[in-house]
Amino acid sequence: MGDKLRLSIGILGNGASLLLYTAPIVTFSRVFKKKSTEEFSCFPYVMTLFNCLIYTWYGLPIVSHLWENLPLVTINGVGILLESIFIFIYFYYASPKEKIKVGVTFVPVIVGFGLTTAISALVFDDHRHRKSFVGSVGLVASISMYGSPLVVMKKVIETRSVEYMPFYLSFFSFLASSLWLAYGLLSHDLFLASPNMVATPLGILQLILYFKYKNKKDLAPTTMVITKRNDHDDKNKATLEFVVDVDRNSDTNEKNSNNASSI
């Protein structure tokens, strides 16, 4: 009964993770359409790739016992493919400055994964020590992946806008981490359960922020130039220009702008 329940939770976790990995398709369709990465960050996708690489390796028979963690291999293998595509698209449309940022995070991830596989395969002789080593690296990778939206959450709080924190990405992150937490506990595997003990509360926090700010727009000031012309003297037409800051979230300023435009 326990094994069947664990397998069922693993299948549900696969489904939730698949939704999590495919959620950025909406974001990258926007990037592709506008041919710009705008204010989106590539850091979460690079960290997700690192997580997928580590846990695919963790689930293979060279680290785990036989195919006891097959669900990890299947879903993280798909994740590697999807995240690689997302990172390529981001890099292609990113500004030169953003491309440097991608390289600074992407190269250490690949080097870190290479070292992890080499050390676990060549230094340790048994599954127990390999799982302990790779699982420890996976713990860091998972916390980095689930914690990477903290950068976006900070932006949400500053701008009071959820434009760059899509709902489905936050929801599927919470759902996937909750299911993998249950899977790890049922498997008595702390290396699977521990990172999701951190990820689940972070997912809840993202959802709280989303629902708090979802109906609010960016509060960044917008500059408007209003011109008033004096037509009493055709030869000397005076033009008065002044600048006002418009708070797009303020009904009062909207009314003042409408009145000013009718002068």
UniProtKB/Swiss-Prot annotation:
Residues 29-42, 93-103, 154-165, 212-263 are cytoplasmic. Keywords: Cell membrane, Membrane, Repeat, Sugar transport, Transmembrane, Transmembrane helix, Transport. The keyword Amino-acid biosynthesis does not apply. Its main location: membrane. The keyword Transmembrane helix applies. Residues 1-7, 64-71, 125-132, 187-190 are extracellular. Pfam families: MtN3_slv. InterPro entries: SWEET, SWEET_rpt. Belongs to the SWEET sugar transporter family. Forms heterooligomers with SWEET11, SWEET13 and SWEET17. This is Bidirectional sugar transporter SWEET3. It comes from Arabidopsis thaliana. The lineage of its organism: Eukaryota, Viridiplantae, Streptophyta, Embryophyta, Tracheophyta. The gene is SWEET3.
